[in-house]
């Protein structure tokens, strides 16, 4: 059964069950700021599930195009190397919005999969999983479907917390959630792997083909599971996976759709068609994601979605280069894709020329730097070592347009570790330079001469407001239309503008069907707030009456982290000393980053004490009070102030019981107990005398602690320790044993070197004035040096050149007895040899080392040394 037929069968089946066939939404989620790309069938129905939107139907079915590349869900590095990872895939789904629930969802899935009228998959090839506490779903499978109990697997909380399970779905920390039931297909005992929940579950024998999510509860901020008044259903079945089942193949790349694309890739690159060639699969996958993204309006750029697209294109082009194709080829595959998928997705046909042009332009642009960049990278890789430095990776990115994951991909092929942390340091330094250059421009770029903004956000999360000004492309306009990016100024705002290290609020400004998504809030002038974002629907005009609403979840997280920062500041001064001053901060919903003046690293004991003091203040649950007062009165309270900061005549003083008093204009919790758990997760130096501390709070801190606990358990298992207390002793014993073995190995190598050296000197060529040894031996660079030093020390007239090859790289070491260095110099000798094997080197007259890359030329080089030395002795 062809993939295209499967797609149609699925939609037809659910249409016969009263479902409305809904067209796939765009890969660009226009109404969900939390998503980079559409990555699941339910994305377009998220507001329906949350109760914010109503549809004229209560049952729906879709074939949804999805992309997983960039962001939280990123399959990019695995694509081409596994049977089922893709950047683009199709998710078949059926949905119930308060209509049917578990019974019908399970019966529908079973009928479609096993009925002779539809897919007719043998029932004994299928297995179901249910959440451990979901007796209702278990009994439906057992008593109504008739599945044997041994093929119904209960999966419990296997991710470290209550309801953290492969079989319990959650939209977020709060909101709709519920158990799920998954259907697995058995690819046969000849393939390794076990059933879900077994130690071998990561194998490829049992593959999930359908997931039925039962949205049954609404989880509140206290973690309580409250039953939803109208439970709903969200299901998903990967089209490529079920196609592999129906076409009796194991890898998704073996299905009809991919087979034709793979042959097209081989045709355009000139490479032989081999299923085991990862580069063919990479390119075949990437032409799908790139073409569909461009069709949905994404173009290659250096930011956001456009940069993810650029990364995918350049990865495909690099794999073409690897296959021997240096000319633009990628765009030529669009026609083949249109032939395969244009019937189901007419936008591919409609925009074929635009897609081809965009891809060709990007290919041509990258071709200008690809060869030079590859040469730089190859040169860095052949120098040896197990790590590629962050500076090189950044240079490839910044100068030659190599995305990080492209370089990491190449390193992976060579078993070399990319220095991601070093690359990030270079990136952060570049961002800091950019921020410094833009700091004035950011506040002054929008012209405005109207009334000031009245900030209501300390006490209100929602205001009724009037639009005072609108901006698009930095210019004042009278209206914003759907899809426009811009800024809005309103008279009353609940949105906090970025200041004092706290990021700006996000949320929505709306009126009826007109909706502006606020993605950032910045000060245009000292007392004028600009809400920056996108008009997601309708139109916004100057003078409109609107409702402005802050995103509560993100605001609450910002408040928790900001209040925790104040407590941490005070605790740091108490623990480290009064010399500690704030040098910078960044408060976001995810964490708080705090820079302080301190001459040395903060010790583990000091960090623990700071954490204890902050959590003690949180447990006290004291009120957080803010008051506006004169600077004179503020000074009398002992409030902490930032050195060099300019303050007005009146200031806002924030007091947290007796724990902290500080000047601050930010938003904060009502009581310290609202912060929840506080945990410092990193500490390090960023400049001379400046330390950076990062901390997290609330559920983020809990998740971090749970991850550490899981890591400890993994270490215990790996070291075969009995308890946590035994782990350190096990590791220390292992390290001591390894050190002893290293010493023993070094001693053995030294003995071998002495024996080998004596034999070499016995076989030396007599040149009259000198004895010449020119040979290749098995040794590393350190051993070569030791042998050469030993030989020249035993003779008054020795000229030595020893070579070794390790992992394809040539090591050379030359030595000359000191009485001969007036005529023959070791540095000249090693340079002469290194140049012939593609390397360079040098050193002292009596001892020198070098390296090279062309091991094939080594025998000829060693043969040529006799004539070179002989000429020097004349």
Curated annotation (Swiss-Prot):
Task performed by this protein: Catalyzes the attachment of alanine to tRNA(Ala) in a two-step reaction: alanine is first activated by ATP to form Ala-AMP and then transferred to the acceptor end of tRNA(Ala). Also edits incorrectly charged Ser-tRNA(Ala) and Gly-tRNA(Ala) via its editing domain.
Subcellular localization: Cytoplasm
Q: Which gene encodes it?
A: alaS
Enzyme class, top EC level, equals: ligase
Q: Which reaction does it catalyse?
A: tRNA(Ala) + L-alanine + ATP = L-alanyl-tRNA(Ala) + AMP + diphosphate
SMART domains xref list: tRNA_SAD
NCBIfam families found in the cross-reference section: alaS (TIGR00344)
**GO CC terms on record?**
cytosol
Task: Output this protein's name.
Answer: Alanine--tRNA ligase
> EC no.?
6.1.1.7
Whether Cytoplasm counts among this entry's keywords is: yes
Free-text domain note: Consists of three domains; the N-terminal catalytic domain, the editing domain and the C-terminal C-Ala domain. The editing domain removes incorrectly charged amino acids, while the C-Ala domain, along with tRNA(Ala), serves as a bridge to cooperatively bring together the editing and aminoacylation centers thus stimulating deacylation of misacylated tRNAs.
> What are the recorded GO MF terms, alphabetically?
alanine-tRNA ligase activity; aminoacyl-tRNA deacylase activity; ATP binding; tRNA binding; zinc ion binding
Which species is listed as the source? Neisseria meningitidis serogroup B (strain ATCC BAA-335 / MC58)
Name the major location: cytoplasm
Can you tell me which residues bind Zn(2+)? 562, 566, 664, 668
- GO terms for biological process? alanyl-tRNA aminoacylation; negative regulation of DNA-templated transcription
User: Which UniProt keywords are present, listed alphabetically?
Assistant: Aminoacyl-tRNA synthetase, ATP-binding, Cytoplasm, Ligase, Metal-binding, Nucleotide-binding, Protein biosynthesis, RNA-binding, tRNA-binding, Zinc
User: So which cofactors does this thing need?
Assistant: Zn(2+)
UniProt similarity note: Belongs to the class-II aminoacyl-tRNA synthetase family.
Q: How is the cofactor bound?
A: Binds 1 zinc ion per subunit.
């Amino acid at each position: 059964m062809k993939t295209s037929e499967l797609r149609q069968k699925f939609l037809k089946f659910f249409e016969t069950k009263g479902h409305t066939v809904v067209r796939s939404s765009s890969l660009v989620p226009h109404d969900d700021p939390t998503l980079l790309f559409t990555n699941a069938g339910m994305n377009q129905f998220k507001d329906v599930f949350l109760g914010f939107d109503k549809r004229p139907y209560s049952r729906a079915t879709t074939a949804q195009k999805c992309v997983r590349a960039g962001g939280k869900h990123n399959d990019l590095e695995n694509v081409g190397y596994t049977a089922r990872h893709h950047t683009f895939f199709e998710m078949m789904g059926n949905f119930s919005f308060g209509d049917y629930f578990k019974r019908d969802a399970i019966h529908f899935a079973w009928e479609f999969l096993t009925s002779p009228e539809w897919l007719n998959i043998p029932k004994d090839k299928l297995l179901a999983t249910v959440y451990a506490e979901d007796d209702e779903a278990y009994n439906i499978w057992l008593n109504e479907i008739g599945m044997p109990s041994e093929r119904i697997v209960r999966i419990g909380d296997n991710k470290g917390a209550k309801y953290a399970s492969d079989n319990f779905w959650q939209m977020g920390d709060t909101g709709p959630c519920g158990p799920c039931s998954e259907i697995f297909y058995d690819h046969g005992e000849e393939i390794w792997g076990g059933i879900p929940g077994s130690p071998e579950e990561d194998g490829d024998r049992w593959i999930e083909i359908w997931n039925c999510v039962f949205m049954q509860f609404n989880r509140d901020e206290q973690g309580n599971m409250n039953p939803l008044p109208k439970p709903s259903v969200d299901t998903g079945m990967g089209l490529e996976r079920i196609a592999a089942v129906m076409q009796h193949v194991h890898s998704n790349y073996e299905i009809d759709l991919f087979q034709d694309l793979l042959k097209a890739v081989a045709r355009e690159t000139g490479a032989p068609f081999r299923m085991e060639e990862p580069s063919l699969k990479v390119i075949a996958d990437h032409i799908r994601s790139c073409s569909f993204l461009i069709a949905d309006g994404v173009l290659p750029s250096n930011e956001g979605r456009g940069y993810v697209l650029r990364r995918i294109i350049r990865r495909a082009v690099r794999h073409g280069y690897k296959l021997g194709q240096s000319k633009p080829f990628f765009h030529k595959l669009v026609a083949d894709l249109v032939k395969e998928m244009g019937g189901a997705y007419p936008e591919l046909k409609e925009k074929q020329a635009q897609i081809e042009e965009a891809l060709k332009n990007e290919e041509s642009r990258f071709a200008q730097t690809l060869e030079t960049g590859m040469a730089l990278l190859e040169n860095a890789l052949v120098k040896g070592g197990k790590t590629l430095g962050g500076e090189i990776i950044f240079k490839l990115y910044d100068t030659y347009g190599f995305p990080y994951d492209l370089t990491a991909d190449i390193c992976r092929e060579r078993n070399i570790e990319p220095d991601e942390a070093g690359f990030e340091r270079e990136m952060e330094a570049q961002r800091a330079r950019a921020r410094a250059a833009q700091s004035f421009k950011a506040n002054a770029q929008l012209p405005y001469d109207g009334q000031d903004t009245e900030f209501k956000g300390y006490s209100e999360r929602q205001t009724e407001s009037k639009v005072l000004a609108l901006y698009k492309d930095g210019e004042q306009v009278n209206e914003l239309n759907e899809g426009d990016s811009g800024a809005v100024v309103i008279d009353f705002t609940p949105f906090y503008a970025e200041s004092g290290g706290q990021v700006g609020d996000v949320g929505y400004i709306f009126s009826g069907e007109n909706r502006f998504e606020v993605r950032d809030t910045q000060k245009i002038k000292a007392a004028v707030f600009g809400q920056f974002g996108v008009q997601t629907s309708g139109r916004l005009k100057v003078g409109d009456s609107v409702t402005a609403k802050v995103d509560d979840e993100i605001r609450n997280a910002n408040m928790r982290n900001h209040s925790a920062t104040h407590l941490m500041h005070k605790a740091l001064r108490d623990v480290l000393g009064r010399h500690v001053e704030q040098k910078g901060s960044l408060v976001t919903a995810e964490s708080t980053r705090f820079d302080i003046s301190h001459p040395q690293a903060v010790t583990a004991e000091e960090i623990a004490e700071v954490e204890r003091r902050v959590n003690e203040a949180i447990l006290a649950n004291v009120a957080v009070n803010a008051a506006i007062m004169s600077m004179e009165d503020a000074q009398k309270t002992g409030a902490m102030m930032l050195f060099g900061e300019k303050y007005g005549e009146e200031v806002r003083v924030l007091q947290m019981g007796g724990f902290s008093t500080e000047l601050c204009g930010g938003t904060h919790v009502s009581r310290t107990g609202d912060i929840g758990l506080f945990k410092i997760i990193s500490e390090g130096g960023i400049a001379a005398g400046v330390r950076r501390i990062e901390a997290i709070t609330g559920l983020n801190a809990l998740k971090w602690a749970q991850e550490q606990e899981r890591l400890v358990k993994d270490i215990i298992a790996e070291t075969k320790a009995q308890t946590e207390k035994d782990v350190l002793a096990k590791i220390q014993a292992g390290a001591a044993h390894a050190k002893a073995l290293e010493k023993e190995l070094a001693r053995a190598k030294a003995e071998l070197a002495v024996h080998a050296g004596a034999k070499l000197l016995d076989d030396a060529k007599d040149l009259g004035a000198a004895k010449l040894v020119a040979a290749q031996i098995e040794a590393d660079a350190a051993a070569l040096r030791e042998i050469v030093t030993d030989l020249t020390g035993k003779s008054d007239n020795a000229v030595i050149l020893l070579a070794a090859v390790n992992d394809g790289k040539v090591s050379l070491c030359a030595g000359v007895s000191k009485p001969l260095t007036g005529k023959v110099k070791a540095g000249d000798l090693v340079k002469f040899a290194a140049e012939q094997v593609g390397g360079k080197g040098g050193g002292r007259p009596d001892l020198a080392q070098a390296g090279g890359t062309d091991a094939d030329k080594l025998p000829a080089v060693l043969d040529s040394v006799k004539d070179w030395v002989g000429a020097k002795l004349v």
